[in-house]
Regions:
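Conserved NTP-binding catalytic cores of kinases and kinase-like/nucleotidyltransferase enzymes
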Residues: 1-86, 202-205, 315-317
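An alpha-helical support segment within catalytic cores of ATP-dependent transferases
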Residues: 7-19, 136-138, 151-192, 202
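ATP-binding pocket architecture of kinase catalytic cores
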Residues: 43-137
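A cross-family kinase active-site recognition segment
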Residues: 111-165, 185-187, 217, 293-296
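ATP/Mg2+ or Mg2+-diphosphate-binding catalytic cores
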Residues: 142, 146, 154, 158, ...
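Active-site acidic catalytic loop and adjacent metal/ATP-binding pocket
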Residues: 31-44, 49-50, 82, 175-222, ...
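Active-site activation/catalytic loop segments of kinase-like enzymes and analogous catalytic loops
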Residues: 221-257, 271-289
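All-alpha amphipathic helical-bundle segments outside canonical DNA-binding/catalytic cores
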Residues: 258-270
């Protein structure tokens, strides 16, 4: 999450007044991530997160994302609900940009997760996959291996080399992953971006899973592979915490056991997960305005992960 758009106190107060959410007391911009502008809102009634959609998120997709939050919340998943305005609308337009008010959930994102926390996250992810099975809407994955391979090739070898001289080597790898991608694994709505900073915890209990703005219809095992890649390595992406990875998969299996095909495909799915983050990070690195209040993230961290999964295969998950 990040702050691209700057709204004054009067603008924010006017917006909050459209909701039955109390009067604005304070608003604090949150400066992390790259896709939206976010504020922590405190009113006379409660705390909320206000999100303004800046990049990647199409207006036509917002009803899907926000209805999904409501569906999962109503199913008992640790997911924040959308706060609808006085007219019942799940989002409002502020100028040419859409903004939504989201329930604030307690908890903190784990910076150095332990196996008990990873196990709880695996269980919560499986719970979401099962609950999403009855969600009436669908959305294609626009960041699957075919698309992310295309993004990297559109960036081009020269631009990728300007980020890191070793990055262009990923182009041939991307083509191979896209060519071998499985299309017959069990599907549901998946989160597809479940990094530790998108999970809130109190101790080893998951209190919130947030930022569903890459959610789509996809292979459930791919979502587990995304989470494995996001949670179980050190910052460099060179060293896997095997105990963390085993606990994550055990937690998932305890709620929704993987079938043999899903388990066999985990190494390739994880490489595809890494490819997705390499592509989005490279694109963000090249496109992010110099004066934006954001941190640029190094795509090489996920090149190292991808190479690990390619070298270790199934042993990365045992």
């Amino acid at each position: 999450v990040a702050v691209y758009t700057h709204l004054g106190a009067e603008d924010l107060a006017r917006l909050i007044a459209k909701y039955d959410a109390g009067r604005l007391v304070s608003a604090k911009g949150i400066a992390e991530g790259v896709s939206n502008s976010n504020w922590l809102i405190e009113t006379t009634q409660a705390r909320y997160i206000l999100t303004m959609y800046e990049r990647r998120i199409e207006l036509a997709d917002l009803p899907f994302f926000l209805a999904l939050l409501d569906h999962l919340s109503e199913a008992g998943c640790p997911v924040p609900r959308t706060i609808h305005d006085r007219s019942g609308a799940p989002f409002r337009m502020v100028g040419e940009k859409a903004a939504a008010l989201i329930e604030f959930l307690p908890g903190v994102s784990p910076t150095t997760p332990d196996p008990d926390q990873a196990r709880a996250v695996g269980s919560a992810l499986a719970q979401i996959h099962l609950a999403a099975g009855s969600f009436a809407m669908s959305r294609p994955n626009d960041l699957g291996p075919q698309q992310t391979s295309a993004i990297l090739h559109e960036c081009g070898a020269d631009a990728l080399a300007s980020i890191d001289p070793n990055l262009p080597r990923i182009l041939d790898v991307a083509t191979g992953i896209a060519r071998n991608w499985p299309n017959d694994l069990p599907l549901s709505i998946i989160h597809s971006d479940l990094f530790p900073d998108n999970v809130l915890m109190l101790g080893d209990r998951v209190t919130g899973m947030i930022d569903f703005y890459f959610a789509c219809t996809g292979a459930m095992a791919y979502d587990l592979a995304v989470t494995h890649a996001a949670w179980c390595f050190d910052r460099s992406g060179m060293h896997l915490n095997q105990a963390l990875g085993a606990a994550l998969v055990e937690g998932y299996d305890s709620v929704r056991p993987l079938n043999k095909s899903e388990r066999d495909h985990l190494p390739l799915l994880a490489q595809g997960a890494c490819l997705r983050f390499i592509a989005s990070r490279a694109q963000d690195w090249l496109d992010t305005p110099a004066d934006a209040l954001v941190r640029r993230k190094d795509p090489m961290d996920f090149v190292h992960r991808l190479e690990f999964y390619r070298d270790k295969g199934q042993s990365a998950f045992s």
